[in-house]
Amino acid sequence: YFGDIYYAKATYLRRKGCPGGWFGDKTRSGGGPLIDLGVHIIDLCRYLMGGHQPVSVYGATFNKLGDRHEIKSEVDYKSDSRSGHDIFNVEDLASAMIRFDNGAVLQIEASFSLNIEKDTGTIELFGSKGGVKLDPDLTYYGEMDGYMTDVKLATQTALSFDGLFANEIN
């Protein structure tokens, strides 16, 4: 269906989503959204791309917005350990390109705080025969009988935090 998967993009971005508490303290957490959120999309993409080994990484991190605890929003991520004296010295945005031993490349972005429209999580895989996007629904892009095709697959939500646990609860 996909042929040789040679490129992938994955994002796990929050507009205002630092949970506070130990999550923002680098000595206790080890880092920000890359370690908290990004590892999951890296793991999933590596699995979907065939489990190849990384051979090089280029990355950049930013701490420009902080945890923005003073800003009110509809969605708020709060750790039970959050207090009025939280430290925030981790990145609020991380971006990287990972090259694998088969030549494929994965581009990732993970944020606790980013000036975007809304929180988003997307995974896209691009192969020599077709591509797929989980956003949160699953859409296949390819060709059929000489025509470019987009096929939206009728599945339960593929990449939704709430959707991930709905089946476990029901």
Task: Report each predicted region and the residues it spans.
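C-terminal glycine/acidic-rich active-site capping loop/insertion
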Residues: 58, 62-90, 95, 99-102, ...
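Glycine/small-residue-rich pyrophosphate-binding loop that anchors the diphosphate of NDP-sugar donors
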Residues: 33, 37, 94-96, 104
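Predominantly a Rossmann-like dinucleotide-binding segment in NAD(P)-dependent oxidoreductases
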Residues: 1-86
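Short, well-ordered coil/turn segments that N-cap beta-strands
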Residues: 2-6, 92, 102-106
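Beta-strand scaffold of nucleotide-dependent catalytic cores
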Residues: 5-8, 57, 107-110, 134-135
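Secondary-structure transition into beta-strands, especially the periplasmic turns and strand N-termini
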Residues: 51-53, 99-104
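Glycine-rich phosphate/pyrophosphate-binding beta-alpha loops
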Residues: 109-117
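Adenylate-forming
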Residues: 18-20, 119-122
